[in-house]
Each structure stands twice: as C-alpha cells, then as structure tokens.
C-alpha cells in the first residue's frame, strides 16, 4: 500500500502482492527484508538485501528526495555495511560522492505504445528481482 501510494502517477512497474512477498523472502534470506520508514513526518519504504558479507543493496528506496539522506542513515543503523547501492526513481541526485547509473531498460514491440510513452520520460523498474 505504501509503495503504490508513493509511486502513484509515476511510470513504474506495479508488482502484485505475491511478488512483494517474494521480495520480502529473498531479502530475509540474506539478512535484509522490507522496511517502512518515517523521516521528519514523511513516510517511505525500502527493500534491502546483503549482496555479500559487507555490501547492502537497497533494491528500492522510496522516500521524498529531501529526506533520502536521513532515511539512508536510519537504514544504515539497522543494516550496517561497508558499501551500499541504492535504487530510487529518477528524482534524486544521490549522496555526495556517489554516482548515478541507470537500471533496467524497456524495449517497445508496439509503435503505438512507444508513442504513448513520450520522449524523455523516465520510468522506474523498482525491485527488478535480479
């Protein structure tokens, strides 16, 4: 419910409940999971997995851009790691010293649907199940 509300109106992949639960299980296997955040009155959510013994992959972090830094700091207290990778919609410039890297792609097999998408539109894949 939180995820859908935060992505409402954005071009994003909408996952059914069973896939969200699948992600929850995958996260737990590695020591992560699904998280609900409250930062300065703003609500958010995250899906995290440990990729190895010291790196955390936030497969999704949804929070308003002005609260991302504080949200990550709160998550780091629960999920410590030497390094973290964070996937967010294309609305956040990242942390100081970080770099941005596109994730996922879309290939249209229908010219009609491609025309509806619009040039320059940034979609959000989210969890990705990689």
Where are these regions (language model features)?
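Active-site/acyl-donor-binding loops of N-acyltransferases
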Residues: 49-51, 59-69, 73-130
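Amide-forming acyltransferase catalytic core, primarily the GNAT-like/NAT-type
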Residues: 1-67
